[in-house]
Amino acid sequence: MITKRIIPCLDVKDGRVVKGVQFVQLRDAGDPVELAKFYDKQGADELVFLDISASHEGRKTMVEVVEKVAAQLAIPFTVGGGINSLDDMKTILRAGADKVSLNTAAVRNPNLITEGADFFGSQCIVVAIDAKYDETIGSWRVYTHGGRNATDLEVVEWAKEAVRRGAGEILLTSMDCDGEKNGFDIALTRTVSEAVSVPVIASGGAGNAKHFLEVFEKGKADAALAASIFHYKETSVKEVKAYLKERGVNIR
């Protein structure tokens, strides 16, 4: 039986972890290396870092952060945000990341997925999809640029294409549920999980341990990601894992 993974997510801007509500009202949440060590001790299975600094200066800082984090961590970590070329992937992976996450760049240039998978192997390539339900198409639409721009892509079709091109994992964020803390988007997660052959990481909406149970059992997710509930200490990775274990979920 495949082990389910719990993954905290850190948004990094200019070398610091920040947290906000729907991409705005950002507040400093500390040093990424210290937080990474904290989550590692708590029993996180992996970590995701999203670089939200748009600046070139911020990008250099991110490489330094990745190097420092890699020196401290035993668990795998993924870095996303602003990775636009094979060279960008090389830089981040050489700095010590285990995987790179492609979002907007992959939509703009789907060939980037293929290039990355051919060069590094599918296990290094995560395609992140920001999804929002659209009644006009009766399904979910793909958004880019941090959820600001709607595309013509339908989520399930795009997820399948990403996997065909070599994505080893899909990081699926529900924009409808994000930050609401009312639970993950079960319908979205299940639909994508059943359509692709690679692991799906559910993201957006975690409010308590029960939500993780639901997304694993009903949403068929392989992993679940959360940010604010862990950062704000509303619950901990340890507590979530204990809750899941008691209910027979196979976790590390």
From Swiss-Prot:
It is found in: Cytoplasm. GO terms for cellular component: cytoplasm. Its EC number is 4.3.2.10. Its main location: cytoplasm. Gene3D superfamilies: Aldolase class I. It catalyses: 5-[(5-phospho-1-deoxy-D-ribulos-1-ylimino)methylamino]-1-(5-phospho-beta-D-ribosyl)imidazole-4-carboxamide + L-glutamine = D-erythro-1-(imidazol-4-yl)glycerol 3-phosphate + 5-amino-1-(5-phospho-beta-D-ribosyl)imidazole-4-carboxamide + L-glutamate + H(+). The keyword Cytoplasm applies. GO terms for biological process: L-histidine biosynthetic process. Pfam families: His_biosynth. Transmembrane segments: none annotated. Pathway: Amino-acid biosynthesis; L-histidine biosynthesis; L-histidine from 5-phospho-alpha-D-ribose 1-diphosphate: step 5/9. It comes from the Bacteria. The keyword Cell membrane does not apply. GO terms for molecular function: imidazoleglycerol-phosphate synthase activity; lyase activity. It is an enzyme of class 4 (lyase). Keywords: Amino-acid biosynthesis, Cytoplasm, Histidine biosynthesis, Lyase. The active site is at D11, D130. Belongs to the HisA/HisF family. IGPS catalyzes the conversion of PRFAR and glutamine to IGP, AICAR and glutamate. The HisF subunit catalyzes the cyclization activity that produces IGP and AICAR from PRFAR using the ammonia provided by the HisH subunit. NCBIfam families: hisF. Heterodimer of HisH and HisF. PANTHER family: IMIDAZOLE GLYCEROL PHOSPHATE SYNTHASE HISHF, IMIDAZOLE GLYCEROL PHOSPHATE SYNTHASE SUBUNIT HISF/H IGP SYNTHASE SUBUNIT HISF/H. This is Imidazole glycerol phosphate synthase subunit HisF. It comes from Geobacillus sp. (strain WCH70). The lineage of its organism: Bacteria, Bacillati, Bacillota, Bacilli, Bacillales. The gene is hisF.
